[in-house]
Amino acid sequence: MALETRKPSLLSRGVRALLMWFYRRQGWTAYGEVPEPRRFIIIAAPHTSNWDFVYYIGLTQSLGVTPHFMAKTGLFRWPMRNFMLDMGGVPVDRSQGGNYVQAMIDEFAKRKEFMLTIAPEGTRGAVRKWKTGFYHIAMGAKIPLVVGMMDYAKK
């Protein structure tokens, strides 16, 4: 599963600009340092709302990060496929028995810079236990796990 290297379309650049405007308009400010080298997994939890994506794009743009994220294959169907890829999406077909852990380890090995965001719950709903693929990818690729947070009260 080699990821496509894409030049973002005018649509995706426009959507990023709009989401960035919305992020700032809501009063959000990003703080922190991005680890170097820029090869790591970002743990995004809890993932509870579709709004998480809007704030995620604003946060990463504010920090100058172009991360990738894993999302279910259904989000990559026409007409959304190119847009999702432009936004950094990595399609994951959960109905197939593919080894996405190894595919992501291989992707990290090919790139000097690759930041992958994973919601360890694997869904927006509440779960009792996280999936462990993020850990196995990090160990196999010998990269750090980065934990960030969004303080909704202080923005």
Which positions does each model-derived feature cover?
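Soluble catalytic domains of membrane acyltransferases
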Residues: 3-8, 25-155
